[in-house]
Structure formats: C-alpha cells, structure tokens
Amino acid sequence: MNQLKIAVAGASGRMGHMLIETILEAQDATLTGALDIAASPAVGSDAAAFLGKPAGVLIESDFAKGLANSEFLIDFTRPEGTLQHLEYCAAHNIKMIIGTTGFDAAGKAAIAAAAEKTAIMFAPNMSVGVNVTMKLLEMAAKNFSEGYDIEIIEAHHRHKVDAPSGTAIKMGEVIAGALGKELNDVAVWAREGVTGARDPSSIGFATVRGGDIIGDHTVLFAGIGERIEISHKSSSRVSYAHGSLRAARFLADKKTGLYDMQDVLGLR
C-alpha cells in the first residue's frame, strides 16, 4: 500500500494535534513533517509528544526542513501563514489541503493561481456531514425561494478570529447560487439599531462566540405558518481530520487543479 506522506501546519494547535493523531492512526498515511511559527515553544520538539508516544518527526519553523519528505501539507492555520506555505508548496510541487478560513479576495486569487502549479483542496469545512448539508441547503433554497426568510446562525469557540465563519459564508454562497444571486448582493452580515423591515430578498447572518464550541451552524427558512431549520453541530474536530485525509486520498493522483469537498464526495 502506497503511503500518503503528510505534513501538518500549526502542529502544536488544537487542530494540528487532531490531525497528527488521525494521521498516526491511519493505515495508509505517514506523518512526515510538522510546521509551526518560529515563536512557538513547540519548535524542536517531537510532533506527537502530546500523545506520549513520539513519532520521530520534529516540529520545524523552516519550511525546507519541515516539508523535506512530504507530498502533502494540511493547513488549518491563518490566512497570512497559509499564503506563505502556499508559495513554498507551489514552488516545490507539494499538494495542499487548506482548511484555513478568513481569506480576502486577493488570498483566494493566490490559491487559484497556485493550483496551476500543484493540486489544492480548498474548503472552509472538511467535514463530510457539513458538505452533505451544503447539498441539502441547495435543494431547500430552490424549494423555499418565495415567501421564506433565510437566516444563517453560527457559533464557535472564543478563540476563533474570523466572523462569520467560512462555513457560514459558504452556506450563504450555496443558497444564493441556488437562487441565481451573488451572496454579496443579498447578505446582511449584522444588524444593530433601527434597521427597518426585513428585505425579503436578503440572507441574514448571526454570529456567536464563546466557550469551547467546536462549530454549530443552523440555516433557518422562516415562512408564514412554518419554519424549517437545517443544522449541523460538530462535537469534535476529528470529523475535520477524517475529511482532510479523505481529501488527501482524492488528491493523490492529481497533478494540478483546485478542488473542494464537493468534488471529493461526488456531490457536483
């Protein structure tokens, strides 16, 4: 069995730990590298030290050392860090699985450009459940296009730095697309003060931050006499890690190109 040679960015973080543990448990994957910022106290330590069973892979801040033996980099960090990793990976033919959120238009354009040089999986959420939910939302939006108000409510832990979440924005894009609209034309990102009556064509967003919430997303279709709620709630980051490995398997035979989890799951 050919082994997927995978490195993890943000190796000392919560998601980094989950990815490392999942890779070490997989039969078809090998942890071959680990990256973190130079200021991290974890640099120089074994990437699996937190498990009490060293993996023989040190956490590096130098890209050349951290990625020397890897075919894939899984990155759930921050946009500025991911874009640095992206430049290196594109230049050295290393495939990327990007779960980082919060990119601006320029960042997304850089990812698309890099995909002409290497294969990239870019998705705001790697969970299989979330991506099946996206398909359900597309179907629902087409059937609740008239007379229903659409609101997207998301909740995450206190440490999350971007809002709304990338998953919530993607849900909005899917719904808007199903209605033949652009999200930026209909989105109401926040409400405060005297806002007036609701625009029936709008898609509203509400954000909650607190505690250790992994990620909850609910889309409300509110009509007269009924309301429909489609929800996904994450209880562990392991679903993101399993989805990331599934993405790596999908990319294994790809040379270049930009993909997302809808491609992996055959939901196009």
From Swiss-Prot:
<dbReference type="InterPro" id="IPR022664">
    <property type="entry name" value="DapB_N_CS"/>
</dbReference>
<keyword id="KW-0028">Amino-acid biosynthesis</keyword>
<dbReference type="Pfam" id="PF01113">
    <property type="entry name" value="DapB_N"/>
</dbReference>
<dbReference type="GO" id="GO:0008839">
    <property type="term" value="F:4-hydroxy-tetrahydrodipicolinate reductase"/>
</dbReference>
<comment type="similarity">
    <text>Belongs to the DapB family.</text>
</comment>
<feature type="binding site">
    <location>
        <begin position="99"/>
        <end position="101"/>
    </location>
    <ligand>
        <name>NAD(+)</name>
    </ligand>
</feature>
<feature type="binding site">
    <location>
        <position position="36"/>
    </location>
    <ligand>
        <name>NAD(+)</name>
    </ligand>
</feature>
<dbReference type="GO" id="GO:0050661">
    <property type="term" value="F:NADP binding"/>
</dbReference>
<keyword id="KW-0963">Cytoplasm</keyword>
<dbReference type="InterPro" id="IPR022663">
    <property type="entry name" value="DapB_C"/>
</dbReference>
<comment type="function">
    <text>Catalyzes the conversion of 4-hydroxy-tetrahydrodipicolinate (HTPA) to tetrahydrodipicolinate.</text>
</comment>
<dbReference type="GO" id="GO:0009089">
    <property type="term" value="P:lysine biosynthetic process via diaminopimelate"/>
</dbReference>
<feature type="binding site">
    <location>
        <begin position="166"/>
        <end position="167"/>
    </location>
    <ligand>
        <name>(S)-2,3,4,5-tetrahydrodipicolinate</name>
    </ligand>
</feature>
<keyword id="KW-0560">Oxidoreductase</keyword>
<dbReference type="GO" id="GO:0051287">
    <property type="term" value="F:NAD binding"/>
</dbReference>
<feature type="active site" description="Proton donor">
    <location>
        <position position="160"/>
    </location>
</feature>
<feature type="binding site">
    <location>
        <position position="157"/>
    </location>
    <ligand>
        <name>(S)-2,3,4,5-tetrahydrodipicolinate</name>
    </ligand>
</feature>
<dbReference type="InterPro" id="IPR036291">
    <property type="entry name" value="NAD(P)-bd_dom_sf"/>
</dbReference>
<dbReference type="GO" id="GO:0019877">
    <property type="term" value="P:diaminopimelate biosynthetic process"/>
</dbReference>
<dbReference type="InterPro" id="IPR023940">
    <property type="entry name" value="DHDPR_bac"/>
</dbReference>
<dbReference type="Pfam" id="PF05173">
    <property type="entry name" value="DapB_C"/>
</dbReference>
<feature type="binding site">
    <location>
        <begin position="10"/>
        <end position="15"/>
    </location>
    <ligand>
        <name>NAD(+)</name>
    </ligand>
</feature>
<keyword id="KW-0457">Lysine biosynthesis</keyword>
<comment type="pathway">
    <text>Amino-acid biosynthesis; L-lysine biosynthesis via DAP pathway; (S)-tetrahydrodipicolinate from L-aspartate: step 4/4.</text>
</comment>
<feature type="binding site">
    <location>
        <begin position="123"/>
        <end position="126"/>
    </location>
    <ligand>
        <name>NAD(+)</name>
    </ligand>
</feature>
<keyword id="KW-0220">Diaminopimelate biosynthesis</keyword>
<feature type="active site" description="Proton donor/acceptor">
    <location>
        <position position="156"/>
    </location>
</feature>
<protein>
    <recommendedName>
        <fullName>4-hydroxy-tetrahydrodipicolinate reductase</fullName>
        <ecNumber>1.17.1.8</ecNumber>
    </recommendedName>
</protein>
<dbReference type="GO" id="GO:0016726">
    <property type="term" value="F:oxidoreductase activity, acting on CH or CH2 groups, NAD or NADP as acceptor"/>
</dbReference>
<dbReference type="GO" id="GO:0005829">
    <property type="term" value="C:cytosol"/>
</dbReference>
<keyword id="KW-0520">NAD</keyword>
<dbReference type="InterPro" id="IPR000846">
    <property type="entry name" value="DapB_N"/>
</dbReference>
<keyword id="KW-0521">NADP</keyword>
